[in-house]
Amino acid sequence: KYCSKKCAPTAPSPYFNAPSQYPATDYKLRPAMMLAGTSFEQVKALIDRGIASDHSFPKGQAYLLSTSDKARNNRATSYAQTAKDLAGVFSLQILETNFISDRQDVLFYFTGLTEVPMLETLGFLPGALADHLTSAGGMLTDSLQMSSLRWLEAGATASYGTVTEPCSFPQKFPSPAVAMF
């Protein structure tokens, strides 16, 4: 129902943008999450970043990138509305570029590329979320596209990735507005 063997839309998730604090009870769904890393030290650092962000209300920048990769840039159409909806909540920049570099204030980074360069030049704040909208970002090893682990290794606290072909349907990837709020 929520997966397709071919590139076709699937049933919408009732949990998307829902106010429920109890999805297992309300929707019979259990959101899947994992602590990912290639070593105990990486996972511990990830946990420590999460703890450091608790109740800190970090004042960072949200970067929403509109890229030249047409297959992975479908969220860009929602960026203007996201900026309007979250005005006064987060400092947000919509940039027409494939990647950012040399920024030390990254709280959110949404882009659409199979590989994101220059991650080593970025400073992710504790609690930062980063995502690159690919078919296989959730394949932690042996992927033909960048693994979501690269974000975590660069200092992000959270990322997202699929392990089966989602066919670039926007509902299969985090909505920046929902993820940030």
Model-derived regions, located:
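Cysteine-dependent hydrolase recognition
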Residues: K1-F181
